[in-house]
């Protein structure tokens, strides 16, 4: 009894000791765990604060990036609108330039055709000019031969002044005008008077469209009427195809003293008179027959 009781007591003591040791171990372990947990919580809290600060910075950066993205989107939309407007503007300019180029090409073609026409016309005019120069040279040779023959037949001893002739060239629209000058016949008994005659003809396409003859000279006053009649008769006699009613004759009389150095003339001697005869014929009148041309 006593042994079993003793063993029970010993067992109870050991159990108490074990329980106490377990409690102390548990308490120490718990305390260590609490300390470790507290340290870990502190670290976690610091990490949390750092994470919160980092999150705050990230949120700030995100907000800044969001604003920048919106600004870039606005810039993108503006650039797209500007690009679209530029495309439309340059498209319109391109269309205008294409129209201008097309017009210039047409104008260039017209200019080329005009140049070709002008070259053809120039060639035709050049050929016509050469032909007319040949005809003029032929007429000049004929006139020179006629003048040589006419003045060679005049008897010597009388002081004669050679009639003057003039040749003037001019252009009428769409035609080439050739002017031919020749001297008309002077009555034999007035050959000692100073008389000059000039006849001008304007020829269009081989037809005479305008003709004028002018003769003037200084004669004695008493012979004015006689000279005028002689000139008129000689003119129509030399040109039988003309009719008096188709020709306009005009006589201009000018008083002119033969001796200009004298201030006064004698009363018994009348001063000489300058007489000018002008004939004009329109295109409706038959043309004067030209002399036949021979080489």
From Swiss-Prot:
Signal peptide: none annotated. Transmembrane segments: none annotated. It comes from Bos taurus (Bovine). Belongs to the intermediate filament family. Residues 1-151 form a coiled coil. Keywords: Coiled coil, Intermediate filament, Keratin. It comes from the Eukaryota. GO terms for cellular component: intermediate filament. Residues 1-150 form the IF rod domain. This is Keratin-like protein KRT222. One of its GO terms (molecular function) is structural molecule activity. InterPro entries: IF_conserved, IF_Keratin-like, IF_rod_dom, Keratin_I.
């Amino acid at each position: 009894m006593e042994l079993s009781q003793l063993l029970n007591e010993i067992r109870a003591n050991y159990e108490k000791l074990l329980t106490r040791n377990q409690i102390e171990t548990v308490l120490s372990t718990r305390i260590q765990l609490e300390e470790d947990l507290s340290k870990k919580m502190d670290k976690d809290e610091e990490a949390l604060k750092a994470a919160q600060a980092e999150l705050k910075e990230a949120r700030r950066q995100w907000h800044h990036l969001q604003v920048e993205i919106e600004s870039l989107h606005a810039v993108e939309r503006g650039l797209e609108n500007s690009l679209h407007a530029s495309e439309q503007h340059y498209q319109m300019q391109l269309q205008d330039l294409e129209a201008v180029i097309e017009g210039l090409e047409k104008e260039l073609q017209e200019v080329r055709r005009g140049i070709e026409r002008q070259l053809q016309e120039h060639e035709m005019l050049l050929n016509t000019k050469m032909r007319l120069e040949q005809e003029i040279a032929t007429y000049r040779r004929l006139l020179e031969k006629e003048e040589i023959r006419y003045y060679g037949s005049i008897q010597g001893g009388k002081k004669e002044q050679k009639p003057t002739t003039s040749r003037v060239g001019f252009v009428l629209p769409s035609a080439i005008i050739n002017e031919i000058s020749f001297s008309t016949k002077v009555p034999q008994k007035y050959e000692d008077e100073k008389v000059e005659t000039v006849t001008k003809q304007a020829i269009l396409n081989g037809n005479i469209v305008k003709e004028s003859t002018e003769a003037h000279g200084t004669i004695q006053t008493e012979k004015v009427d006689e000279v005028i009649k002689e000139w008129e008769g000689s003119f129509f006699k030399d040109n039988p195809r003309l009719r008096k009613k188709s020709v306009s004759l005009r006589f201009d009389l000018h008083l002119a003293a033969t001796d200009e150095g004298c201030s006064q003339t004698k009363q018994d001697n009348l001063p000489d008179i300058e007489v000018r005869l002008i004939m004009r014929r329109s295109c409706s009148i038959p043309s004067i027959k030209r002399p036949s041309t021979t080489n």
